[in-house]
Amino acid sequence: MAQVAIIAASDSGIGKECALLLAQQGFDIGITWHSDEEGAKDTAREVVSHGVRAEIVQLDLGKLPEGAQALEKLIQRLGRIDVLVNNAGAMTKAPFLDMAFDEWRKIFTVDVDGAFLCSQIAARQMVKQGQGGRIINITSVHEHTPLPDASAYTAAKHALGGLTKAMALELVRHKILVNAVAPGAIATPMNGMDDSDVKPDAEPSIPLRRFGATYEIASLVAWLCSEGANYTTGQSLIVDGGFMLANPQFNPE
């Protein structure tokens, strides 16, 4: 039986690119979507073109714990799970003094609670299978440095980074490796861009002077799913074009 990778929010952007690269590596792919079903179907068509299976399910992490049960449906349809990529997320910006509690909770529900529940479902199945597995959390550079006027998002990404380390330490006895990938400014639909926006000198405030491509995140995820990463766990790997070396976002006014 082929190995199975489930990628949350794989209807576009980083999640879609992860699905396609893992399909090229021979994984059957579980695809989830929140609001773009057609995007998920497009991903599935491209996945199947690589000669592997694809299954689609809607995943609403704003409604927990019930929403996370969609992951169990995918595991049942695909027969197992070997890789989980927690790529779903919510984000809003507001000054700390103006942040509404409801908005705060919405971000934490999706970004932290959702990742916790999906990881728990996946890890329990991996333990049952007895063959180990990989869990990869897509965080952000703001797991490591604050995003101005985004206290909830910053705190949630820090929390997900901490969860990554805690899971890695506990699950290693089951040969389940857990890591985070922390993207910088990537050309994704969530950011109002696509890979055509990855141009030289398009963003001079980043040392590499451009936005990142979704492939540049997905290729690291794919490596973390490979035998080459058999000795890597509990890490947060930053892919940011040098942003963290020269964070330009703080404006002292």
Locations of the language-model features?
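Alpha-helical segment proximal to the catalytic Tyr-Lys
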Residues: R124, L169-E170, N230
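Substrate-binding pocket helix/loop in short-chain dehydrogenase/reductase
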Residues: P95-F96, E103-F108, A202
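Conserved glycine-rich cofactor-binding loop
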Residues: D11-G13
